[in-house]
Amino acid sequence: MSEKIRVLLYYKYVSIENAQEYAAKHLEFCKSIGLKGRILIADEGINGTVSGDYETTQKYMDWVHSDERFADLWFKIDEENQQAFRKMFVRYKKEIVHLGLEDNNFDSDINPLETTGEYLNPKQFKEALLDEDTVVLDTRNDYEYDLGHFRGAIRPDIRNFRELPQWVRDNKDKFMEKRVVVYCTGGVRCEKFSGWLVREGFKDVGQLHGGIATYGKDPEVQGELWDGAMYVFDDRISVPINHVNPTVISKDYFDGTPCERYVNCANPFCNKQIFASEENETKYVRGCSPECRAHERNRYVQENGLSRQEWAERLEAIGESLPEFVGA
């Protein structure tokens, strides 16, 4: 039996001087111990997800904690059967979370060390979910929500996190006087967004401390009131959260049956994320539309080495055709 792999999810807002130099040093250490993952380092802090065996991840956590700036950094740990990443990336960015405030005339960025919402533990957050006078906002991207979310949470009509401030301003009259509670995967986005809500004048703002990842591990709530699975930005794609009465809420793009398997459309110029079973991925050559299925650079066709005849036969089976100039 192969050794278990640990996946570490973490962040911390803290001032990092010479952050670019620190990012290079960080990458060098990670590679020296064989760690895999993706880490963002900015002047405002660090945000990462990494994976490795027990010894490797323990070395990494000990090394990070040995730096007084990160002595109290909170690692959220999952155990898996295989690596969640194939390579090691450490990038320097201007921010570890980009809310897009300065880009969209929303004044200056938020410093969560100065302004942020009240921290709620899993039990308190569950109580908020059941409170009719509390508005619960999902701050993640649309494709994350579609895979899984808290029961009763509002799905803002946005595609990504940077569009959220404008959506709130457009709809603030609906919940300005109510208590507003927000959540995200591990907490890093909510630290900044809840602070922005406070600055916008919302009087009672809370956030799920440690994010969905922590809620699912809490021995008391055990992920209850979460529907579906949680989207993660690594090779796992999704992880279970509700250990009381789990459900599948996402549906196969092609036939509407329950499905939690995310794939990207095979047309590289589309790349839309869709739910699809292996059977339907094969049947529809992973294309989300007739145009994508017949696109000359269809990646499914290339990856599976389909001949032009095999490709054409797949499309004919679903009532479509391959243009003469494609694959000729």
Swiss-Prot record:
Record-annotated active site: 184
The Rhodanese domain, residue ranges: 130-224
Alphabetical list of InterPro entries matching this protein: Rhodanese-like_dom, Rhodanese-like_dom_sf, Rhodanese_C, TrhO, TRHO_N
Catalytic activity: uridine(34) in tRNA + AH2 + O2 = 5-hydroxyuridine(34) in tRNA + A + H2O
E.C. designation(s): 1.14.-.-
One Gene Ontology term of the molecular function aspect: oxidoreductase activity, acting on paired donors, with incorporation or reduction of molecular oxygen
Keywords assigned by UniProt, alphabetized: Oxidoreductase, tRNA processing
Pfam families hit by this protein: Rhodanese (PF00581), Rhodanese_C (PF12368), UPF0176_N (PF17773)
Free-text function comment from the UniProt entry: Catalyzes oxygen-dependent 5-hydroxyuridine (ho5U) modification at position 34 in tRNAs.
Family indicated by similarity: Belongs to the TrhO family.
Protein name per its UniProtKB record: tRNA uridine(34) hydroxylase
The organism of origin for this protein: Streptococcus pyogenes serotype M12 (strain MGAS2096)
Gene name, Swiss-Prot/TrEMBL: trhO
